[in-house]
């Protein structure tokens, strides 16, 4: 009976170590994919030709409430 318990304990230890080994690369791959996606979105946001058409409408409305004219300049709203 004691031998069976020792064998079961060793089997459980081997299985748990294999699970830990498999989990680390998976988590690392998910983190890498998330950081790549974040960097792509950040790069797109830095390009004003993609963001200004969306922001310009909000900027014009914002500046119109201030009775000024608004322009989108590098993703910033400039009221003049």
Curated annotation (Swiss-Prot):
Gene Ontology biological-process entries: defense response to bacterium
Disulfide bridge partners, by residue number: 52-72, 59-77, 63-79
GO molecular function: toxin activity
UniProt keyword Transmembrane helix present: no
Residues the record marks as site: Important for insecticidal activity, but not for antimicrobial activity: 74-75
Organism: Liocheles australasiae (Dwarf wood scorpion)
Domain BetaSPN-type CS-alpha/beta: 49-80
GO terms for cellular component: extracellular region
Tissue localization of expression: Expressed by the venom gland.
Domain of life where this protein originates: Eukaryota
Family label: Belongs to the long chain scorpion toxin family. Class 2 subfamily.
Domain remarks: Contains 2 domains: a N-terminal domain that is unstructured or forms an alpha-helix in presence of membranes and a CS-alpha/beta C-terminal domain, which consists of an alpha-helix disulfide-linked to antiparallel beta-sheets. The synthetic N-terminal domain (AA 22-51) induces paralysis in crickets within 15 minutes (EC(50)=11 nmol/g) and is not lethal even after 48 hours. It also shows significant antibacterial activity against E.coli but does not show any activity against S.aureus even at high doses.
Protein purpose: Dual-function toxin that acts both as an insecticidal and an antimicrobial peptide. May inhibit voltage-gated potassium channels (Kv). This amphipathic peptide causes significant antimicrobial activity against E.coli (MIC=7 uM) but does not show any activity against S.aureus even at high concentration. In vivo, causes paralysis or death to crickets.
Site (Important for both antimicrobial and insecticidal activities): 42
Protein name per Swiss-Prot or TrEMBL: Peptide LaIT2
Record bears the keyword Secreted: yes
PROSITE patterns for the chain: BSPN_CSAB
Site-annotated residues for Important for antimicrobial activity, but not for insecticidal activity: 36
Compartments (UniProt record): Secreted
Residues of the signal peptide: 1-21
Keywords carried by this UniProt record: Antibiotic, Antimicrobial, Disulfide bond, Neurotoxin, Secreted, Signal, Toxin
